A protein has these predicted regions:
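AAA+ P-loop NTPase nucleotide-binding core of proteostasis motors
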Residues: 1-172
Length: 172
């Protein structure tokens, strides 16, 4: 409800052959995660272009991925396992809430962070990602990592209007 334009932009971005990764930006609580869930619902209902009809949306919890990785190599091993799982199932769209956290995640002074580990798969198109972050974190963190940021299309998410908010409440 009230997010048709943003959902349309998201579907068009994910369905593209090049630069098909998307980062949803907006204030806290504006519904970025709900939009990713809306995409999953559209896919289940078959209301998307054929190129993404067979896709499944997975959510990656970066906090759980990093938790307990106290030794060098633990995080890299988890990322490697994630990459292998995603390669075995190519019809996955990965949703990463708070995507700015992948920059620096798991890195020590001589290891790669999650962002650098994802770049090759993003560049080749083997991995489709939808991220969500606040405008502030996008500017402060994500935008400064230009090699990663250029692989994403930014889609702004505004607060819903009062009318749309009331409609959402009526449907719940």
């Amino acid at each position: 409800v009230g997010r048709r334009d943003v959902l349309r932009d998201l579907v068009q971005t994910v369905a593209r052959k090049k630069k098909s990764n998307c980062v949803l930006t907006g204030g806290s609580g504006v519904g970025k995660t709900a939009i990713a869930q809306g995409l999953a619902k559209l896919i289940v209902e078959g209301k998307v272009p054929d190129v993404i009809k067979n896709k499944t949306v997975w959510e990656l919890d970066m906090t759980k991925l990093v938790a307990g990785t106290k030794y060098r190599g633990d995080f890299e091993e988890r990322m490697k396992q994630l990459g292998e799982a995603l390669q075995k199932q190519p019809d996955i769209i990965l949703f990463i809430d708070e995507i700015h956290q992948i920059i620096g995640a798991g890195s020590t002074n001589q290891s790669m962070d999650a962002g650098n580990m994802l770049k090759p798969a993003l560049a080749s198109g083997k991995l489709k990602v939808i991220g969500a972050t606040t405008d502030e974190e996008y500017r402060k963190v994500f935008e400064k990592e230009t090699a990663l940021a250029r692989r994403f299309t930014k889609v702004s998410v505004d607060e819903p209007s009062v009318k749309d908010a009331k409609e959402v409440l009526k449907q719940t």
